[in-house]
């Protein structure tokens, strides 16, 4: 499973959008991202606006034409990923058009610095920008409200941010100047949709409590194999008389 940190590597651009699937309900996006493409192989995971996608082409070459480890994206700076209807309907990727900017991040590697917080790339919902950055305020779906707390972490379009204020149906974050320039958050205007991912730890804690976390954890083991009863060894007295118990 890929794990991200919400620290954007590069702000890329949508180069092309085409339909995929028998019904044409899916999309293939081609992105221009010179920095990221140099590090990318076909099959790698990439967070696009906080949504985990798989690279199916790198440098304009499909997976079938690429050898393992070949990074042809170095030459063109382009790569492609597919998104199914489920992803398009649950995120803001369904509204992407040619020329749109996107936030891109590669998964956390062994030894990398955890600069933000643990992000799965599984978008929990979308919010609408109410006030633009730097004092970014976003609408909060009722189903996610209980996971967003003051001074807690939240991911907005793939960017790890600290919650400043939580309201009944919205939350606010402070976006620093660097983040405004290095990500799409500096370009978002009121009314636009952003992807939201809440803290996964909060979701696991809720699940444990609802399932009855007072029951202690006990590791399970396979049932012991059933074997025939071993014969009872003769007693010392029986061995002395040369007889055995019946």
Regions found by a protein language model. Name each.
Residues 1-246:
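Conserved loop->alpha-helix
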